[in-house]
Amino acid sequence: MTSGAVPSCRRVTLALLCLVAGRATAQVDPSGSWRTLQTAHFRIHFRPTTRAAAEHEAREAERAYGLLSRELHAPRGVVDLVLGDDIDAANGFATMFPSNRLTVFAAPPTTDPGLEHFDDWLRLVTTHELTHVFHLDRTKGWWRVVQSVFGRVPGTFPNAYQPSWVAEGLATYYESRLTGGGRVTGSFHTQVLLADAAAGHRRTPWNAVFFTRWPDGYAPYAYGSRFFERLSEAAGDSAIPRFIERTSGQLIPYRVGRQVRRASGRDLQTEWRAGPARAAARSIVPAGNVLAARLWTEPVPRVSPDGRRVAYLWDDGKSAPELRVADAATWRPLRRHRVNRGVRYDWLGDTLIVAQLDFTTRWRIRSDLYRWLPDGAWRRSTRDARLVEPRAGGGRLIVPRLVPGGNRLDLAGLDTAGVIWGEVVPSPNAQWIAATRHHAGHWSLVRWPAAAPESLAVLVDDGGTVSDPAWDGEALLFVADWTGLPQIHRWAHGSPLQRVTAAPFGARTPAALPDGSLLYTTFTAGGWELWRAAPAATIPPPLPEAAPFDSAPPVPVHETGYRAWPSLKPHFWLPLFFDQAGAGRFAGAFTYGSDALGRYAYALDVAVAPSPLRAQGGFALVSHALGNPSLDLSAARQWSLVFVTGAGIVVSEREDHAALGATLEARRWRSFARIRLAAEYRGDGYVADPAQPLASVCVGCVTRDEVGGSATLNLGHLVSAPLAIAPDHGTLLTAVARRREQQGSPRWTNELLGRLLWYARAPGVGGFAHSVLALRAAAGGRAGPGAETFGVGGVSSGVFSLGLGPTLGGSRFFPVRGYAGSSVNGRRAATVSLEYRVPLALVGQALGHLPVGADRFSAALFADAGDAWEPGERARLHRLRSAGAELVADVTVSYDVPLRLRVGVAEPLASPPGGAARRPQGYVALAADF
């Protein structure tokens, strides 16, 4: 048998295994001890170390459930809620498949401008994610009929087909309506919408989805939530539940505008245009200088104690973010260093103290401190310390430490009960400490003598968000959004409060320079900008009062150990039918799922043929119960027809496969190492029907049982960015060693495979991303009496999942474009491909009102070469060789699902084996092959 292409899984079970395993690894560390708090509507899973936060979460979850159920239909069944504390970043996510479940990360968003407007972090994130469950679980009409028969089948939830601004807009609308915070009433989304409107970049309802172009992931949240806010103002609060009910039963689930009109009597486009149009008139150009522009992350400025240098974050979306240092007077760049995400920093003397995220285990992402010394040396100071927001002054460094559900300061005498700290900043003379403090549902600005933390005084304690404290001599600069936009204010002892900026789209993160000017960041339609301007002091308007805050009431809870089965059990099934001609007509079912923690993931299918009576199917299980390594077990059987003799005797083949493996993985932010060791079984058997000796009807039908093992090594280091068309730096290495021995026979097979992928930034004509040079080299060999041959040639495609197992595309280990698959065969093979990739256009536009869109386009010029040969023969790697070009289109289907299409033409540079004519070959492929 020749193996030209890397085959896709032949069993539905194995095709699903990667999906369920991937979902499991995307959550929390499922190993170790977990407990469960059972409430009326939730199973809340937590580690014993997060018990206090879990009890808080139980109260907030039931509060959110009660408020949402007053307006929306309650979801079916008990909701599994996982309280994770493995990532030092604020986030959460929800899913309605295989059952209703959500995950909340306990770390609070202390300085994230998009999330800092909250009265209680767990309240806000739980309300947001639970709204997704209420919304997406709702089904009516024929969708409910299908689910009543087959269960919670993927693809039968109509509200999941709508554009992302609907789901995220609804969740953001309710997070703001049902809590004392939220992004609708915060200022960050106002900045997003004002900047887009002023630049004429307002998104339509079909473009406010997850396109790559700026503002990227902010758009669905900002546009969607403000639309639903306006709709509720125009048609009443009840219009929102009516809209959800309408979309939950519509036959064509992509429609939005019709259901808006039927639910509210309002026109989608008219209401959509109303909000941003009001903002356009506010566009003015402030006085000052732009120092950095079109950045994807806020370039927070930090001025060195001597006032001569400025550190800021440079993230243009084209390559990895960098921490840069520039001369404060001339803005001449002095040095730079690549950083990860979650980056915050400050000067301690002439050294930069940097906090950033990185993997500390396979599952855990922690914020640790690094020191960037004046000589350019970069040294890690802590590991697994959970230290965030370093601020320094007068030679003193203060860094809050994250704890489950909050953070703490290691300062004796400071009252920290019920407090979440923002930035804590020592004064330049080290006599005072200023901080932003979240307490009793809102932020305030506080100050205390460095030697007497118990003498804390509240300087500003009003409504809105207070953030970004910075010293200006003995005065304090800070940011407040009392006017609806964030602006910089100045507090000085004995003087009235002043507002010192009036930036049209807001100003954040102030830093004072020795000449009296200010550095600050602002938001535009092209991204973040860093400005330098003179302060313009004005008296701010009367300050709003802080809203009252009430804790969620106690709820009855029952604590148990974690039990996987309630969420692990099958939640759906689908029928299977296979017609294998004379080998049997099979009917059966399949299912798959995972538990709430992602500790186990499985897939199962079984089918039976009545005549002749046979069964086929498969089972696959992945276990992350140990954390590292992961274990996997799979087994499958399949029947197929070989031939039918002239006498009507049917010869069928039975293929059996089984494997038991263990995978060990180590990870860093841009690097990983993974090794899998597996024991494997493969069996082939033949059956004649009616039964008789096989040798009399099929000479080559020999039963084989092969037992062996394999080792697979993957090593990688990749540097990429949101706009990148490919990694612009890095290497991926895959190596496979396998041995199989046929039982009862001296036949054996050894196999070695290796593939190297290499990427480097290349000179180009510019554009929205960097040009990239990419290399792929692959080689393999097989030896032994049972060795099969490799096939070289053909186009290798990525794989696009259609859901429920089926996929489009398929990869080849030894492709050479311009030739047919397996044009040459042998037990030795090697290929090499070189590509030059260039960006063409960043589009980010829907195709009319259809749920498809064009995200971006790029192109590639390539050259391929390869050969296959037998041991003892001379390799001719130019035997197959070609050159050509590809147009690469990144598109979206179903509004937000990304799909990459490659349309290419390859010119063979050598005559195909067998004497076929040499002519250009066109092709269409899916996804990226490398």
Per-range role (PLM):
Residues 27-157, 163, 171, 210:
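Juxtacatalytic substrate-recognition/specificity segment
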Residues 27-38, 215-219, 233, 242-353, ...:
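Beta/coil-rich, acidic/histidine-enriched accessory regions frequently appended to metallopeptidases
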Residues 28-30, 99, 121, 125, ...:
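Acidic/His/Gly-enriched intrinsically disordered linker/tail segments
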Residues 183-184, 295-296, 314-323, 337-342, ...:
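A flexible loop/linker signature enriched in serine peptidases of the S9 family
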Residues 262, 268-307, 313-314, 337, ...:
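Extracellular/periplasmic ectodomains of large secreted or surface enzymes and adhesion receptors
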Residues 296, 522, 527-529, 534-633, ...:
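Outer-membrane beta-barrel initiation region
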Residues 301-309, 344-352, 390-396, 424-432, ...:
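Blade-terminus and WD-like Trp-Asp/Gly-His loop motifs, strongest in beta-propeller folds
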Residues 556-564, 631-650, 659-663, 687-865, ...:
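C-terminal outer-membrane beta-barrel translocator/porin domains of Gram-negative envelope proteins
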